[in-house]
């Protein structure tokens, strides 16, 4: 047992050392020659000191992300190989009389252990954001958000475990298919209630306060055939200096949300471009496409998980102290497989997201007919968020849900030079 834990610990340390070297010792932040002197060149809109700080901040945040990903994996492996997972199950069975309550208790203890192990890394990330003046959130507010997240995820997680293990016992061969079929309406339900029930637990949402800006947005929304009452402002200035806007929800609860930091720090032309971008997501139904894609990928994922889970339990039954696939003590193994597979498909999902973001950028430029506002918006996003204009390759692959700032500015410049725009100017 100790050898396995030591080997896993060594692998984790070597993994961390690689990413330390990757971000802090080997990084080449040189701007391509073709970009120098253009609007995509960070030297044209950021001071040397700002560039240095953005580089430092991004490297630290990226490093924390990459060492955080396998931390759960290491924890789950240790719980299994040490027999702690089995001991927790036996302890709860002795303390609680009913199977339902035993499952709830086991999930609670596992969730609590996972939270306590990952909390220090989350705390470091929060402190880094404070140190670089990105976060404005108080410690009490940050702690409150952590508690809210735990009590939102715990009942959802518990429900999933109860259903999955019931299916594994009753339908050993087809449990993965039935589980996926149940996730379809469940995912739709969560998407539907998120804007009106879950999100307001963290922040205050309200209609736009700036009525003059609202009238401009109404005109833009009318051009895009979008209901104006679907545009909201959210109070984020108490937590961050960063800028953002997004589309969320489905059906009657679908809405476009603007952070108040965005409204406070950008001029009207930039805000209108951002609205045009988000309207592009709305018009092109990217939320629905993303949801459909998620459900299709999850179908394949459940199938793969079933095969891996069955084979892994058979091969490691003795080492992990498991009775079989139905054993609740095997839950860390199931979570390990889900987590690894989810991370493995991240490059694909990010590539799809970058494509959609690029399309939304194009839509926003065409709707507002203001390329300069788009370029200025991207530049301001980099400055206020201390974003790397051209992040390292692994960051683009595993964290890049949006094109890089450099790519977005270059795309905007290409949009300006496109044949249809040249023809329109003649």
UniProtKB/Swiss-Prot annotation:
Keywords: Hydrolase, Metal-binding, Metalloprotease, Protease, Zinc. Zn(2+) binds at residues 277, 281, 357. Its cofactor is Zn(2+). One of its GO terms (molecular function) is metal ion binding. Binds 1 zinc ion per subunit. The active site is at 278. InterPro entries: CAXX_Prtase_1 (IPR027057), Peptidase_M48 (IPR001915), Peptidase_M48_N (IPR032456). Belongs to the peptidase M48B family. This is Uncharacterized metalloprotease YhfN. The lineage of its organism: Bacteria, Bacillati, Bacillota, Bacilli, Bacillales. The gene is yhfN.
């Amino acid at each position: 047992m100790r050898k396995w834990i030591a080997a896993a610990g060594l692998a984790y340390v070597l993994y961390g050392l690689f990413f330390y070297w990757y971000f802090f010792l080997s990084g080449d932040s040189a701007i391509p020659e073709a970009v120098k002197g253009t609007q995509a060149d960070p030297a044209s809109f950021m001071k040397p000191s700002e560039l240095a700080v953005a580089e430092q901040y991004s490297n630290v945040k990226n490093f924390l992300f990459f060492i955080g990903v396998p931390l759960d994996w290491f924890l789950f492996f240790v719980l299994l190989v040490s027999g702690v997972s089995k001991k927790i199950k036996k302890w709860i069975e002795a303390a609680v009389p009913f199977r339902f309550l035993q499952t709830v208790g086991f999930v609670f203890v596992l969730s609590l252990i996972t939270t306590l192990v990952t909390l220090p890394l989350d705390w470091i990330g929060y402190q880094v954001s404070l140190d670089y003046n990105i976060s404005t959130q108080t410690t009490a507010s940050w702690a409150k958000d952590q508690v809210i997240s735990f009590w939102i995820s715990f009942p959802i997680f518990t429900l999933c475990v109860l259903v999955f293990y019931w299916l594994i016992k009753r339908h050993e061969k087809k449990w993965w298919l039935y589980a996926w079929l149940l996730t379809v309406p469940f995912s739709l339900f969560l998407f539907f209630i998120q804007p009106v029930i879950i999100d307001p637990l963290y922040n205050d949402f309200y209609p736009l306060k700036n009525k003059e800006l609202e009238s401009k947005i109404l005109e833009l929304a009318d051009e895009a055939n979008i209901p104006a009452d679907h545009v909201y402002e959210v109070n984020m200035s108490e937590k961050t200096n960063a800028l953002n806007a997004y589309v969320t929800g489905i059906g009657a609860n679908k809405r476009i949300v603007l952070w108040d930091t965005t409204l406070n720090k950008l001029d009207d032309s930039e805000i209108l471009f951002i609205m045009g971008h988000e309207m592009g997501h709305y018009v092109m139904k990217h939320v629905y496409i993303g949801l459909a894609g998620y459900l299709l990928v999850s179908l394949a994922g459940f199938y793969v998980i079933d095969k891996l889970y069955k084979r892994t339990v058979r091969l490691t039954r003795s080492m992990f102290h498991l009775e079989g696939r139905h054993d609740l003590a095997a839950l860390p193994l199931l979570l390990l497989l889900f987590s690894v597979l989810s991370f493995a498909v991240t490059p694909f999902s990010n590539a799809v997201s970058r494509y959609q973001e690029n399309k939304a950028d194009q839509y926003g430029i065409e709707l507002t007919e203001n390329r300069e506002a788009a370029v200025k918006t991207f530049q301001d996003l980099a400055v206020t968020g201390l974003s790397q204009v051209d992040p390292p390759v692994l960051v683009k692959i595993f964290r890049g849900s949006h094109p890089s700032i450099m790519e977005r500015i270059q795309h905007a410049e290409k949009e300006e030079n496109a044949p249809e725009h040249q023809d329109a100017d003649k």
